[in-house]
From Swiss-Prot:
Residue span(s) of domain Macro: 1-174
Record's signal peptide: none
Name of the protein in question: Uncharacterized protein APE_1648.1
Pfam families linked to this entry: Macro
InterPro entries attached to this UniProt entry: Macro_dom (IPR002589), Macro_dom-like (IPR043472)
Domain of life: Archaea
Source organism (scientific name): Aeropyrum pernix (strain ATCC 700893 / DSM 11879 / JCM 9820 / NBRC 100138 / K1)
Length: 189
């Protein structure tokens, strides 16, 4: 795990399973209809139960650039923040959607008083973007929201290649190498 400190906030890149992270909230790179079929959304639904999708669908449609929050069902995370990267399931997306979704998720987490949030590669996978690109967009969103996002943002990579891509994207966005992480962060991943 590598960390970048922005004021009193920490942005981390970690390898793991988003459905097992013990952050207060996890982010679902949703579609505007809130259908949780494939990718990270499908994994969150399978692990946390259909109640997550049912709650989210009651709030649909949600445009790209906005986010909604639901319970975490039976996930270790208390909440799921649904931030659409696409209008309909299975769409290829432009890079700006990864930024808009990341920004919306972090802004909502801050407004809800959430202290720790875990995010997958928003827009990679089903959306068709590279992990490095979407990690750069997430880091840029955090940088713009400086001081107005949760204490911990954890970008969760599935596998070594995705981890390297996330690390590269964050490094490009922030212009510095990541370093050691606070000891209390390890309990979340």
């Amino acid at each position: 795990m590598k960390c970048w400190t922005l004021g009193d906030r920490v942005l981390a890149v970690s390898m793991g399973d988003l459905t097992k992270v013990r952050a207060e909230a996890v982010v679902n790179p949703a579609n505007s209809l809130m259908i949780m079929g494939g990718g990270a959304a499908g994994a969150l639904k399978r692990a946390g139960g259909s109640v997550i999708e049912e709650e989210a669908m009651r709030k649909a449609p949600v445009p790209v650039g906005e986010a909604v929050i639901t319970s975490g069902g039976s996930l270790p995370a208390r909440f799921v923040i649904h931030a659409p990267t696409m209008e309909e399931p299975g769409m290829r997306i432009p890079l700006v959607n990864a930024f808009k979704a990341s920004y919306a998720a972090l802004r909502l987490a801050s407004e809800a008083g959430i202290e720790s949030v875990a995010m997958p590669a928003m827009g990679a996978g089903v959306g068709g973007l590279s992990v490095a690109e979407v990690a750069r967009e997430a880091a840029m969103a955090a940088s713009i929201l400086r001081g107005k996002w949760p204490r911990y943002i954890i970008l969760v990579a599935r596998g070594e290649e995705a981890y390297r891509g996330m690390e590269k994207g964050v490094r490009e966005a922030l212009g510095v190498e990541g370093g050691e992480c606070p000891a209390d962060l390890a309990r979340l991943v």
